[in-house]
C-alpha cells in the first residue's frame, strides 16, 4: 500500500470510520456554469461493491471522476463539498494527485492498454511509486495477472504488445494494472459495456473476488449486472442522488417512485 503525508493528517471532525472507505458530503460539481451534481452525500462501505445506476447524463461517471480528481485535467471543472478518504478531504488543493490516483485506481469503459508490452503495462505505475528489483517486479506482475485470471493466457508472451490482446483480455489487463499499485479503492466506469457476454461474466466473477481486498465503485447501465455484483446500489437522476440501499432492497422494494420507475423500465 502506498502511503504519503497527503493522507496522514486526520481532522478529528472527520476521523475515518473503519467501515467506510469513501464518505461523500454535500458534494456539488460544475462543468463551467453547468451544475452537474447537486448536494450528493453517500458512504461507500469498505471492501464492498457499490453500483451506481441511472439514465445517461445523470452524473454517475462525473461522481466517479471526482474521487481521484480526474476532473483536474480539464479546465473549467470544479467540485465543492467533501470526499473523505483516509481521514482527509481529497478536494483539498494541496493534495498529491499522483499518490491519490495510485491509491484510488480507475478502469474506463473502453479498454485502454498503454502502447507497450503486457509486462510494462503492469510495471509502469509500480515503477513510479516503488523501487522494486527485477525479481520483486516479476512477482508483482505475476500476482496481479493471476488475480485477474490472465496469467495463464499471457505468461509466454509478456513482452508482446498489449494491443494484441482481445478486448476482454485488455480490460482484465487494465484492472490488473490498476491493482498493481495496491490501491484501497477501485473505480470502474461501465467496464463491461464494450465486451461480449463471456468476457463480461469473467469481469463480474473477478469483482466478487477483488472486493475481499478493495472497495469497488462501479458505474453500470446494466441493472442485472448491478443486482448480480453489488452489495449497495445508488440511483442517480438529473445530477441528484435519489436513493441508496442494499442491492436486495433496491431491486425488490425501492423507497422512491422514481427508482421504481427506472428499474422497471418506465424511463431511462
From Swiss-Prot:
One GO cellular component term noted in the UniProt record for this chain: plasma membrane
SMART domains attached to this UniProt entry: AAA
InterPro entries: AAA+_ATPase (IPR003593), ABC_transporter-like_ATP-bd (IPR003439), ABC_transporter-like_CS (IPR017871), P-loop_NTPase (IPR027417), PstB-like (IPR005670)
UniProt enzyme class: translocase
Keywords, ordered alphabetically: ATP-binding, Cell inner membrane, Cell membrane, Membrane, Nucleotide-binding, Phosphate transport, Translocase, Transport
Binding site for ATP: 54-61
Enzyme Commission code(s) on record: 7.3.2.1
Major localization class: membrane
Xref: PROSITE patterns: ABC_TRANSPORTER_1 (PS00211), ABC_TRANSPORTER_2 (PS50893), PSTB (PS51238)
Topology versus the membrane: Peripheral membrane protein
Catalysed reactions, semicolon-separated: phosphate(out) + ATP + H2O = ADP + 2 phosphate(in) + H(+)
SUPFAM superfamilies per record: P-loop containing nucleoside triphosphate hydrolases (SSF52540)
Domain ABC transporter: 22-263
Domain of life of the native organism: Bacteria
Single GO MF annotation: ATPase-coupled phosphate ion transmembrane transporter activity
A single BP term in Gene Ontology: phosphate ion transmembrane transport
Keyword Membrane: yes
Subcellular location: Cell inner membrane
Assigned protein family: Belongs to the ABC transporter superfamily. Phosphate importer (TC 3.A.1.7) family.
Subunit (UniProt): The complex is composed of two ATP-binding proteins (PstB), two transmembrane proteins (PstC and PstA) and a solute-binding protein (PstS).
Function: Part of the ABC transporter complex PstSACB involved in phosphate import. Responsible for energy coupling to the transport system.
Name used for this protein in its record: Phosphate import ATP-binding protein PstB
Species per Swiss-Prot/TrEMBL record: Gluconobacter oxydans (strain 621H)
Amino acid at each position: 500500500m502506498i502511503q504519503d503525508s497527503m493522507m496522514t493528517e486526520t481532522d478529528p471532525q472527520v476521523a475515518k470510520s473503519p467501515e467506510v472507505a469513501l464518505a461523500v458530503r454535500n458534494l456539488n460539481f460544475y462543468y463551467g456554469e453547468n451544475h452537474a451534481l447537486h448536494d450528493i452525500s453517500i458512504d461507500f462501505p469498505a471492501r464492498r461493491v457499490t453500483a451506481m445506476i441511472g439514465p445517461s447524463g445523470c452524473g454517475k461517471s462525473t461522481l466517479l471522476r471526482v474521487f481521484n480528481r480526474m476532473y483536474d485535467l480539464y479546465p473549467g471543472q470544479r467540485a465543492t463539498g467533501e470526499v473523505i478518504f483516509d481521514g482527509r478531504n481529497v478536494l483539498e488543493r494541496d493534495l498529491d494527485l499522483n499518490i491519490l490516483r495510485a491509491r484510488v485506481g480507475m478502469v474506463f469503459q473502453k479498454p485502454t492498454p498503454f502502447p507497450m508490452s503486457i509486462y510494462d503495462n503492469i510495471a509502469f505505475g509500480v515503477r513510479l511509486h516503488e523501487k522494486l528489483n527485477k525479481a520483486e517486479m516479476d512477482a508483482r506482475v505475476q500476482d496481479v495477472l493471476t488475480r485477474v485470471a490472465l496469467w495463464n493466457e499471457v505468461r509466454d508472451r509478456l513482452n508482446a504488445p498489449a494491443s494484441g490482446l482481445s478486448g476482454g483480455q485488455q480490460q482484465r489487463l487494465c484492472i490488473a494494472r490498476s491493482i498493481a499499485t495496491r490501491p484501497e479503492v477501485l473505480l470502474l466506469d461501465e467496464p463491461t459495456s464494450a465486451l461480449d457476454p463471456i468476457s463480461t461474466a469473467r469481469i463480474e466473477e473477478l469483482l466478487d473476488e477483488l472486493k475481499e481486498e478493495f472497495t469497488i465503485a462501479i458505474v453500470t447501465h446494466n441493472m442485472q449486472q448491478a443486482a448480480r455484483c453489488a452489495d449497495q446500489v445508488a440511483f442517480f437522476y438529473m445530477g441528484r442522488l435519489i436513493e441508496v440501499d442494499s442491492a436486495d432492497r433496491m431491486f425488490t422494494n425501492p423507497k422512491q417512485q422514481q427508482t421504481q420507475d427506472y428499474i422497471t423500465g418506465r424511463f431511462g
